[in-house]
Amino acid sequence: FKQKTAYEMCGRDWSSDVCSSDLTNLTKLAKENRLEPMIGRSNELEEMITVLARRFKANVLMVGDPGVGKTAIIEGLAQEVAKNNVPEFLKNHEVWSLEIGALLAGSKYRGEFEEKFRTVIGALEAKKNCILFIDEAHTMKGAGAGNNSSLDFANMLKPAITKGNLKVVASTTWEEFYESFEKDRALMQIGRAHV
């Protein structure tokens, strides 16, 4: 049995179960007019694009009260990318949304979660020009960790976000931000945007 690479597992069309069940291509949905138009959030979108323009640590954490439209902003970015109405450095990018719950739910044991995680992140890094959106980012803390292990989703994601191999946009509430993110200096490297 030959171990496949992440890119081979997902393939060029990303049709494999590993990637299609856990990732949603928001840019593709935008091209198919299946996303609601973003209204009145142009300042927040510009702020996000400014952070994504950085060469390293080009990551955004949107913090705001529940229901203020954090997900709508990333969908607005996907629509702008689909229309090619973005700065040169974001052209030909794709915005992908990751379902942490789906990633966890399909894992029967701890090692399988790590394998799925590495496959998904590895495929995004290999594909290049990808922006990963993680909604309810506070769920990263502790997700997939074993009883005697501190290795969870957040710790596995840190190398990708600190090296700049992957652009990440995450969202959370103020309450969860103070509880989860302020205590973790490595996760605080994600640039914060108020929504």
Protein language model features and the residues they cover:
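N-terminal pre-P-loop "Q-motif" helix
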Residues: 36-48
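Loop/turn-to-beta-strand initiation segments
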Residues: 58, 94, 127-132, 163-169
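A short beta-strand-to-loop transition that corresponds to the Sensor-1 phosphate-sensing loop
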Residues: 136-137, 170-176
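Short glycine-rich substrate-engagement loop in P-loop NTPases that contacts/grips substrate
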Residues: 100-124
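Single conserved hydrophobic/aromatic residue that forms the stacking wall/gate
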Residues: 1-14, 18, 193-194
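AAA+/P-loop NTPase substrate/partner-engagement loops
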Residues: 83-109
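Walker A/P-loop
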Residues: 50-57, 61-90
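Short regulatory helix/loop adjacent to the ATP-binding pocket of P-loop NTPases
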Residues: 145-147, 175-189
